Amino acid sequence: MQYSAQFNRAKVLVLGDVMLDRYWFGATNRISPEAPVPVVRVQENEERAGGAANVAMNIASLNVPVRLLGLTGKDEAARALMQLLEKQSIHCDFTQLDSHPTITKLRILSRHQQLLRLDFEEDFNNITSADLLRKLESAVQNYGALILSDYGKGTLNDVQKMIQIARKVNIPVLIDPKGTDFARYRSATLLTPNMSEFEAVVGKCHSEEEIAEKGLQLIKDLDLSALLVTRSEKGMTLLRPNNAPFHLPTEAKEVFDVTGAGDTVISVLATALADGRSYEEACYLANVAAGIVVGKLGTSTVSTVELENAIHGRTTAGFGIMEESQLKAAVELAKARGEKIVMTNGCFDILHPGHVSYLENARKLGDRLIVAVNTDNSVKRLKGETRPINDLATRMAVLAGLSSVDWLVAFDEDTPQRLIAEILPDLLVKGGDYKPEEIVGSKEVWLNGGEVKVLNFENGCSTTNVIKKIQQLKE
């Protein structure tokens, strides 16, 4: 079966314990004269979304609309967190309190070691959920799935009411449980405990059969629709009443850091279910995503590009749709192998024989062909409000199917000049009636010792002509 990482129908609502993670990095080479502790000279800092906010970031990285509900203080940390989230187009709908700080965790690191963590928090157990419940009731019917993200900080004190609000409108509720009191999650659609959390509730399991038996009993006891047990290096197991256990082996090639892997799993699960996928497909995609994220350092997200490439068996240095950072790494490896890198760019709105022939000819000029593709906003600025006809994901998916294309990357500017200057191909190619010196990026390539070449398009082949023919047929 052919799976896809394009979630065009999905919209996800997240409610839970939101946090701000702060990191201070510095050098340490002496002990304080005041106490037997190292002195850290802070050189840089970083801020990341944590808790339920990291779940929302994972969903946003899949190009899916997401709304986040939670509790924060009225403080600088809340503003910093909102800025991080809104930069990723996440709709923040926080209940802000004068009485509590925004949950913030400050980590001080030196030489890749965490020396100290400072927590700024006060749990929300004594806070009424009335405002959150009102917001949830107002919003939930507009979304395809609800994630309740529980880190035990008190935001989900009224978790039963939250579950019932969503179930009334037939919205699936997914929860990554906290603690051993799973009864508080009764009637949720799906729980995603890891193996240790699962065994803490049902007891030690000595076989696959025992996991299935105890899991199905838990589903019955809690009136769940499904249970997904994540099992580290053993993969994950989906259990549903009247269905055989669905086991997926781990997709991880190398494990650097499991931080945030649970957030990635539940995010992809909810997104896939909100998009109308089956439980089995949702679990497959979540398993692939988990295999990607544990290969990264720190709390990370998985992009649509990475997920699509992993589904189709593409490696970072192999071929396919890439993010700019991945492309740079792939080009560096290819150049180290002595391969000649060819680069071209365009909108490629409606792929026609002229495009195919041009790309085949460009590929023959070297060992690897990079195609830089204008984003939808970039095309709109260049071609007008009616363009593009096909969105970026569609255009790149079609181009990725051509054997002549090795790597695809998107750019949002009007021209790819910055991208070309970063990549510095051995040969820059453009189709049309240009003079080499007129081609964007030619100066940068020449200064680096590269070449610039103009190729001809086939006569009569153009996207504009294709659009005109379609319009004539409509008339």
UniProtKB/Swiss-Prot annotation:
In the N-terminal section; belongs to the carbohydrate kinase PfkB family. In the C-terminal section; belongs to the cytidylyltransferase family. Pfam families: CTP_transf_like, PfkB. CDD domains: RfaE_like. It comes from Histophilus somni (strain 129Pt). GO terms for biological process: ADP-L-glycero-beta-D-manno-heptose biosynthetic process. InterPro entries: Bifunc_HldE, Cyt_trans-like, PfkB_dom, RfaE_dom_I, RfaE_dom_II, Ribokinase-like, Rossmann-like_a/b/a_fold. Residues 343-475 are annotated as: Cytidylyltransferase. It is an enzyme of class 2 (transferase). Disulfide bonds: none annotated. Catalyzes the ADP transfer from ATP to D-glycero-beta-D-manno-heptose 1-phosphate, yielding ADP-D-glycero-beta-D-manno-heptose. ATP binds at residues 194-197. Homodimer. Keywords: ATP-binding, Carbohydrate metabolism, Kinase, Multifunctional enzyme, Nucleotide-binding, Nucleotidyltransferase, Transferase. Pathway: Nucleotide-sugar biosynthesis; ADP-L-glycero-beta-D-manno-heptose biosynthesis; ADP-L-glycero-beta-D-manno-heptose from D-glycero-beta-D-manno-heptose 7-phosphate: step 1/4; Nucleotide-sugar biosynthesis; ADP-L-glycero-beta-D-manno-heptose biosynthesis; ADP-L-glycero-beta-D-manno-heptose from D-glycero-beta-D-manno-heptose 7-phosphate: step 3/4. It catalyses: D-glycero-beta-D-manno-heptose 7-phosphate + ATP = D-glycero-beta-D-manno-heptose 1,7-bisphosphate + ADP + H(+); D-glycero-beta-D-manno-heptose 1-phosphate + ATP + H(+) = ADP-D-glycero-beta-D-manno-heptose + diphosphate. This is Bifunctional protein HldE. SUPFAM superfamilies: Nucleotidylyl transferase, Ribokinase-like. Residues 1-317 are annotated as: Ribokinase. The active site is at residue 263. GO terms for molecular function: ATP binding; heptose 7-phosphate kinase activity; heptose-1-phosphate adenylyltransferase activity; phosphotransferase activity, alcohol group as acceptor. Its EC number is 2.7.1.167, 2.7.7.70. GO terms for cellular component: cytosol.
